Design a protein with these regions (language model features):
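Primarily recognizes Gram-negative and organellar outer-membrane beta-barrels
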Residues: 1-291
Length: 291
């Protein structure tokens, strides 16, 4: 396998803003907190020209893809430790994060039975494809697009209460942990493939298309309760009894809608944009549930 060369050019811009909080009143309370916002934009272009050698003949392929992405996220954390007196210690630690991600990709490719650069400057240009097809030098061409979106919310919390029962280390601790997450992802993808040297039953170029819309909401939550009793039995030696109960719940409801029975190229006039689901769904000839 040989290659004429490839080009990858990408840009990635990031931003971050943060805030920290610290407060302490000795022997009574400690507070720590932070908030972070992060944003990123990505842009990656890939251009590839290659040749595959099989015996004395070769096949040539060109591919051009453009990928865009962006992410916004918030993260907040807090910690409180309170000691109202020498016998009690209470700790509380919550956190929450929010994240949204977007992506869109456009890719074009074509396969040739001769080196296309001997006849045209830009093999993936529509006019070039048409010219090379008339000269029987194009094997197939393909166009794919994808838009994706993700939305995730996550929250966690812990509260712990410790009570000293004596001055020699006897104590009891109760701890409760909880977690919750809600995620939602969507993807709409199109693939249009045309074979120039494979005819259908009507004597026309054979085509293939795959159009899919995927939805995947997921929810998870759970909690845990733990109780611990410590009894000193010797110098720096303790006997500990503990009990823990955990519960968790998870639900994922994935849906896939297949629009491949629509005509080839039905979405050609749509330019992929972030969260542009409605532009695609407006082209449907039947209700979404029928797919």
């Amino acid at each position: 396998r040989g290659g004429f060369g490839g080009l990858r050019q990408g840009l990635d811009a990031t931003k971050m803003v943060g805030l920290n909080l610290n407060y302490e009143k000795k022997n009574l309370i400690q507070l720590d907190g932070s908030v972070r916002w992060n944003h990123s934009d990505g842009n990656l272009a890939t251009k590839v020209a290659s040749e595959n050698f099989v015996s004395s003949s070769g096949s040539f392929a060109n591919r051009l893809s453009q990928n865009y992405s962006r992410t916004n996220s918030w993260d907040a954390r807090f910690r409180m430790e309170w000691t109202p007196d020498s016998m009690w210690n209470i700790m509380f630690r919550p956190s929450i994060s929010l994240k949204k991600t977007d992506g869109r990709t456009i890719s074009s490719s074509a396969a040739f039975n001769e080196d296309p650069y001997e006849y045209v400057d830009n093999p993936l240009d529509d006019a070039s494809i048409e010219q090379l097809a008339q000269e029987d030098r194009v094997v197939n061409k393909q166009k794919t697009t994808t838009i994706s979106y993700g939305d995730a919310t996550t929250a966690n919390g812990m509260i712990q209460v410790n009570r000293k029962l004596s001055g020699n280390g006897r104590n009891v601790t109760l701890r409760v942990d909880g977690n919750y997450s809600d995620e939602d992802s969507k993807t709409f993808s199109t693939q249009d493939l045309q074979y120039f040297q494979l005819m259908d039953m009507l004597g026309q170029d054979s085509t293939y298309q795959a159009y899919r819309y995927n939805l995947m909401p997921t929810k998870n939550w759970g909690y845990a309760v733990k109780a611990v009793y410590s009894e000193p039995i010797a110098n720096k030696t303790y006997l500990q009894f503990s009990y823990q109960y955990k519960y968790s719940f998870s639900k994922s409801d994935r849906s896939t809608y297949d629009f491949s029975r629509l005509n080839n190229g039905v979405f050609d006039n749509i330019t992929p944009a972030y969260r542009s689901w409605e532009s695609y769904l407006a082209c449907l000839t039947e209700p979404l549930a029928d797919y």
